[in-house]
């Protein structure tokens, strides 16, 4: 009976050692869980970004409205018959040395 109790205590000690100090111990487990959570958050942001890009690609393939909007915003395109006006705010006029 004493040998059985001694054997069980040794087994319990070995398991406790592996749990707290051995490979794949509890602290490593917690660290990996935080890394997984961070990676999942990063993946979520990338999935949202990819969805936006997919929608933009579909929009560009379907019609000319998205292409026209992009050309207007990025390239300054003006349609024939339209007049382009640039509105300069008051803060820009104050910084302009030629406007005294």
UniProtKB/Swiss-Prot annotation:
Keywords: Cell cycle, Cell division, Cell inner membrane, Cell membrane, Coiled coil, Membrane, Transmembrane, Transmembrane helix. Residues 22-100 are periplasmic. GO terms for biological process: FtsZ-dependent cytokinesis. It is found in: Cell inner membrane. It is a single-pass type II membrane protein. Its main location: membrane. Pfam families: DivIC. It comes from the Bacteria. The keyword Membrane applies. The keyword Transmembrane applies. Part of a complex composed of FtsB, FtsL and FtsQ. This is Cell division protein FtsB. The lineage of its organism: Bacteria, Pseudomonadati, Pseudomonadota, Gammaproteobacteria, Alteromonadales. The gene is ftsB.
């Amino acid at each position: 009976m004493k040998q059985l109790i001694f054997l069980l205590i040794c087994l319990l000690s070995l398991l406790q050692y592996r749990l707290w100090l051995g490979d794949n111990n509890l602290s490593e487990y917690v660290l990996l869980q935080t890394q997984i959570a961070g990676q999942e958050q990063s993946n979520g942001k990338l999935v949202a970004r990819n969805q936006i890009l997919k929608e933009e690609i579909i929009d560009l393939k379907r019609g000319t409205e998205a292409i026209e909007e992009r050309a207007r915003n990025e390239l300054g395109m003006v349609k024939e018959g339209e007049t382009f006006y640039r509105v300069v705010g008051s803060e820009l006029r104050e910084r302009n040395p030629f406007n005294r």
